């Protein structure tokens, strides 16, 4: 039996009879199930050369065809690695001339950065053998780095929606002593041990790393809640997908880092897969979903655009890439450091939860969606900012702001089957507590911890190959073009456009090497091709994009590629595909 991993729907076989379930099955509209397609992997490509700085070699195989419609799935990974002994020494950056060279990675440093008290080399070799360490006049070493700096320095995989390894060096200061003022230091704090009030003078200033052009603490935080109600799991899935869509025409997804795959619906952040998996058991049509989220901003930042200093690990990997194109080696680089890098964004935290509602119990007890909505803010003591539920008012005494959290909501609302939370940012202690109990006290404590433990909650980004134009390493055009070529192939290989067609508003999912269709309410089948509820024959169905074609030949300094809204096309006046069907690029 075919099972869907996220929000899976059980398939019901058709049998004549007189039971209640069989009467439902008798209403199934006959439709032709698409032919099963089995997964195909290529043979292993040859091993890469031994990476001398890692003493490892790698090989890969391509996903020629994901399995579809119940076809045989593939087993095993697409990546493989083995230990090796390199005949050549560990590669270093080009000779540094009169400048200092870090022993381990070969990074070049200006002489004034040696023995200045900052570890500008990962191995600390620039600060070893120093008889007299020069300390800056302002003694910047007493300041902590700006909160969240190491998170903003990470690469980002647009397919997996996961952070990758560090791209920027978040600990490099370039001999500069630039600080950021924190206005919150004036707030009085209480020390229970010494029983005294004090100002947090040690948090008055934070030090800004070289790769950060701007960083500004936010004085105001957005602490309002937004809520949306979804009638079934597929409806929730669809809106999560649209909320995270990107203009580049790439299908985003959730997947293990070792085996990048695409899933066309996802939440953001590294915990998205777990968040969706917890909802998997609530896939029956009797369940509805109230999705509630709040976002708190703590800082705005912008990264340096030119003369970027790369993380030493990335620098080392970049120097090992061959000048001649090798997809396996370049794809491994993308897999490690991400498809994109962050250029600017917002720090803070996100608290999101989904209330799983048993609609049958609510109907029996006379509980309405309006009443549920009125109770949402009461559990954690804050108000509703916006709601997509038409005609719902915020006033009323159905659920007061008691601040008792999940217990308050479960007690006052009949039909709340479960509350599934996801927390991003803040201290690990309060974040863990908030996940299991969303009371006013835990919410406020978590919010206060965000200032010094934020994550990147909104950001702008660029493809990873563009970074090579803006480093301090000199010309890298050949490797940049190779990386761009590899990224196009990488994004296409693991895109959910290779799945489908999923009919009747079904959502295509590429999980590992297996394609699946998440069906909307009243639809069944491996391709959601069957109708199990009367009156849905003229149901409006949205269209889905095909994959992009290959790039055309270069003409007049540009080339183009196209895609079609036929996977499947819109039906009965359904929504056409969003986005452009044509892309151009310089060549």
Swiss-Prot record:
Residues 499-529 form the EGF-like domain. Changing residue 263 to V: In strain: Mae/Stm. The chain crosses the membrane at residues 248-256, 259-266, 377-384. GO terms for biological process: complement activation; complement activation, alternative pathway; complement activation, classical pathway; killing of cells of another organism; positive regulation of immune response. Changing residue 469 to Q: In strain: Mae/Stm. Residues 38-91, 542-586 form the TSP type-1 domain. It is found in: Secreted; Target cell membrane. GO terms for molecular function: complement binding; protein-containing complex binding. Residues 1-20 form the signal peptide. Glycans are attached at residues 44, 437, 545, 548, 551. Its main location: secreted. Heterotrimer of 3 chains: alpha (C8A), beta (C8B) and gamma (C8G); the alpha and gamma chains are disulfide bonded. Component of the membrane attack complex (MAC), composed of complement C5b, C6, C7, C8A, C8B, C8G and multiple copies of the pore-forming subunit C9. Belongs to the complement C6/C7/C8/C9 family. This is Complement component C8 alpha chain. It comes from Mus musculus (Mouse). The lineage of its organism: Eukaryota, Metazoa, Chordata, Craniata, Vertebrata. The gene is C8a.
């Amino acid at each position: 039996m075919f099972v869907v991993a996220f929000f899976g729907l059980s398939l019901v076989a058709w049998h004549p009879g007189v039971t209640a379930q069989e009467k439902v099955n008798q209403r199934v509209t006959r439709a032709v199930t698409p032919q099963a397609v089995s997964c195909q992997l290529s043979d292993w490509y040859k091993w890469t050369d031994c990476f001398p700085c890692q003493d490892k070699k790698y090989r890969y195989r391509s996903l020629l065809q994901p399995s579809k419609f119940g076809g045989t799935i593939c087993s095993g990974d697409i990546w493989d690695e083995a230990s090796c002994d390199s005949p050549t020494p560990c590669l270093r950056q080009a000779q540094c001339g009169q400048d200092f060279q870090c022993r381990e990675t070969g990074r070049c440093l200006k002489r004034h950065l040696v023995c200045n008290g900052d570890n500008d080399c990962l191995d600390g070799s620039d600060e070893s053998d120093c008889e007299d360490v020069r300390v800056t006049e302002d003694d910047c070493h007493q300041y902590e780095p700006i909160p969240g700096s190491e998170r903003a320095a990470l690469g980002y995989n647009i397919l997996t929606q996961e952070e990758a390894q560090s791209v920027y060096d978040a600990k490099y200061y370039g001999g500069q002593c630039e600080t950021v003022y924190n206005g919150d230091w004036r707030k009085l704090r209480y020390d229970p041990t010494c029983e005294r009030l004090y100002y947090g003078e040690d948090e008055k200033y934070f030090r800004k790393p070289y790769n950060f052009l701007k960083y500004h603490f936010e004085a105001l935080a957005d602490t309002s809640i937004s809520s949306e109600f979804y009638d079934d799991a597929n409806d929730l899935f669809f809106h999560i997908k649209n909320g995270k869509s990107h203009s580049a025409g790439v299908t985003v997804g959730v997947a293990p880092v070792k085996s990048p795959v695409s899933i066309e619906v996802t939440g953001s952040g590294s915990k998205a897969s777990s968040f969706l998996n917890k909802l998997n058991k609530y896939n029956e049509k009797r369940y509805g979903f109230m999705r509630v989220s709040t976002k708190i901003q703590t800082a705005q930042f912008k990264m340096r655009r030119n003369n970027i200093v790369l993380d030493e690990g990335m620098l080392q990997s970049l120097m090992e890439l061959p000048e001649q194109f090798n997809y396996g080696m370049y794809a491994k680089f993308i897999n490690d450091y991400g498809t994109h890098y962050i250029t600017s964004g917002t720090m803070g935290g996100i608290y999101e939860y989904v209330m799983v509602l048993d609609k049958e119990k609510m109907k029996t007890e006379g509980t309405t969606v309006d009443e549920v909505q009125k109770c949402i803010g009461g559990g954690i003591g804050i108000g509703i900012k916006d709601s997509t539920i038409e005609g719902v008012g915020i006033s009323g005494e159905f659920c007061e702001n008691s601040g008792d959290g999940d217990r308050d909501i479960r007690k006052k609302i009949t039909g709340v089957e479960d509350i599934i939370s996801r927390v991003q940012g803040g201290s690990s202690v309060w974040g863990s507590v908030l996940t299991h109990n969303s009371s006013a006290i835990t919410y406020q404590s978590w919010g206060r911890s965000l200032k010094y433990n934020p994550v990147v909650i909104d950001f702008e980004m660029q493809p990873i190959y563009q970074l090579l134009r803006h480093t301090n390493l000199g010309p890298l055009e050949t490797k940049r073009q190779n990386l761009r070529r590899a990224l196009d192939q990488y994004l296409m290989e693991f895109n959910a456009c290779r799945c489908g067609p999923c009919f009747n508003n079904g959502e295509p999912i590429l999980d590992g090497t297996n394609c699946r269709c998440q069906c909307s309410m009243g639809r069944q089948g491996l391709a959601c091709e069957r109708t199990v509820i009367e009156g849905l024959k003229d149901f409006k169905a949205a269209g889905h994009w095909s994959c992009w074609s290959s790039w055309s030949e270069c003409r007049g300094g540009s080339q183009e590629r196209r895609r079609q809204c036929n996977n499947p096309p819109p039906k009965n006046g359904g929504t056409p595909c969003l986005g452009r069907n044509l892309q151009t690029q310089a060549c």
